[in-house]
Amino acid sequence: MTSLNQDIREKLSRLNVFEKIIVANTIVYLFCFIALRIQGSGANLEWLSLSKSASEVLSKPWTLLTYGFIHNSFIHLFFNMVILYFFGRSFSNLFKQDISLKVYILGILSGGFAFVLAYNLFPSGILNTVGALVGASAGVRAMIIFLCAYLPNKEVRFFTFQFPLKYIGIAIVLFDIPGLFSQNSGGSIAHFGGYLLGYFYATQFNKGNDIGEFLNRILSYFSRSSSPLKTVHKKKKNSFAGKKKEEFDTFTHQKQIDLILDKIGKSGYE
């Protein structure tokens, strides 16, 4: 039994942060599935899902995050995790893991806030009546829009066509607008919360501001067991190619991003 536990720990330690999130989402889904099978529709999952009632959210503030780990069907879970997996890998190639993880988590929180605010600010009857909010879609969409806003003019090839990322982002947002008037209007509202967060994060990050910096300490344990991040040791008056260390690092990182995206733009997705 001890060797089995060690084997599981070793395998988990090799996963990146997004693979761990996928594992966590899958475990929670299986737990909820079993609970519903045993207790039927009487299974109470309100302590994890996000209510549209402001008073309930105030009494269970953790649900602003935990709702992102609950999914109401296998298809719902599957598509969110597939998108998260591929975009998580793309983010890991372009940015440090802590940046992509902060975008994802803040996207979930922003989507949750948007959902609760909309149903408490707009008069009843404007939005369709919905139950509790579940799903990681807001976090996933925040990641997509972050990438599109951070590198808007980079072109990605789809079959025989090439599109700038900014147009792909606009198309995704426009495609979600009809959902605001559907039976799943609550979910679409959360999506737009993720869109806004992703866009705002990217525009600030382009200016050198990391709006998710306050999460660094909270998320530090994710990076300990995943691939180590680069450590920068500050030295006084050091220069690299006539530039300060920070300027040189920024320049080099941008060049790496350009090289990766040039490869993506040339090879494309077919």
Indicate residue ranges for each PLM-predicted region.
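A detector for small-residue-rich transmembrane helices and their helix-helix packing motifs
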Residues: 1-256, 260
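Structured cytosolic domains appended to multi-pass membrane proteins
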Residues: 256-270
